[in-house]
Amino acid sequence: MTKFPRWLAILVGLLFPLSALTQQQGLTIDIVGGNTAATPIAVLPMPYHDSAGAPATDVSGVVAADLNRSGQFRTLPLGQITERPTHGSEIRFPTWQALKQDYIVVGRVLDARQGTYRVEYELFDVRNGKRMLGLAMTARASAMRDVAHQMADAIYEKITGLRGAFFTRIAYVTASGSHGAMRYALMVADSDGYNPQTIVRSAEPLLSPDWSPDGKKLAYVSFEKGGSSIYIQDIATGSRELVSSFRGINAAPSFAPDGHRIALSLSRSGNPEIYVMDLVSKQLIQLTNSFGIDTEPVWSSDGKFIYFTSDRGGRPQIYKVASVGGTATRVTFQGNYNATASVSYDDKKIVVAQGSGNVYRIAMMDQSSGSTVWNTLSTGSLDESPSFAPNASMVLYAAREGGRGVLYAVSADARVRQRLVSVDSDVREPAWGPYRSVH
């Protein structure tokens, strides 16, 4: 049977059944799998050098966890660390060469007074002893995880040449309670699932969160008025704007790269079609006009094209149309079900929910080499809603395990997975946010 889009499942009552659950708390996190071919790196403990109270955050532990879950690095286990230098001048490189480490990170945490801490760290190439990075950052105790994520980003970029995406955020929806008394929440958290923040609470379903390019707002679908409506909400202030509540379906908002427009799916003229809305004038441009269901639009990085899901050919596939209108062309040809596309920053990779029979997994279409290569990234049977990290090194997606919804973040080579689970609610509808500005 052809799988319905998420918003259509809501409308016809096809939501997965939920057991009785209480209101959500934070996510529990664990790493699944490992990459033996990853680059070995030793991230040494960074002790606190002062008599005042130490920060609660284990900075080096967060850095190591970030690098591990990227799939590009394999950090040396603490039990195998035989020496613990905190300055580059203290490193004995033959020790780390014998441990077959390519890189080493050392550092220390200092009291910077007035409730702040200073983290100093260095990155070295073990093979030649060259210092590749030496930086210091100062922050309050509450921001030490942010500091650690930024450190991991800097290390990742220095070694790989690609900007890190650890200092980013994710959005997702939780669902708790039982039928007749369901509660939904739109949440925002750090990229590793820590520091969850509730953005919206509702007794009606919430769907399809999408980040503005500056990371300050979220567009989403709410059913609080009975039918579907699209809102845009400011994360910091909580203020929100109703932008689409036309008769029929209002679904799948997607911010343009310029932040001034959204693409969306509307059934105001009959079948669900793809539109573009100017967020100032609210003027609509209709891009598609087919006999099938056109939904789940997502923009190319330059804003010139929109990818979307359509069953105009009989089964759901990904199509592409110019953002100013024109003839749509089919993009996916492998498999009889491809939906819910997410496009990489360079437009060379697309991840989709790919179905075969009753099994739905996350697959990536990679055109980086000039030819089309498909890889399956997930291992479940009901995996959906993939979302690229801003550097395309990881993919966030939703899955079903034991009758409940969980999230996974998988490395682009599929070798490392991070599972994000709420102890008291379903987790679904993930969206990876853009790069955050560093102040």
Curated annotation (Swiss-Prot):
Residues 1-22 form the signal peptide. It is found in: Periplasm. Pfam families: PD40, TolB_N. Keywords: Cell cycle, Cell division, Periplasm, Signal. One of its GO terms (biological process) is protein import. The keyword RNA-binding does not apply. Belongs to the TolB family. HAMAP family: TolB (MF_00671). Part of the Tol-Pal system, which plays a role in outer membrane invagination during cell division and is important for maintaining outer membrane integrity. The Tol-Pal system is composed of five core proteins: the inner membrane proteins TolA, TolQ and TolR, the periplasmic protein TolB and the outer membrane protein Pal. They form a network linking the inner and outer membranes and the peptidoglycan layer. This is Tol-Pal system protein TolB. The lineage of its organism: Bacteria, Pseudomonadati, Pseudomonadota, Gammaproteobacteria, Lysobacterales. The gene is tolB.
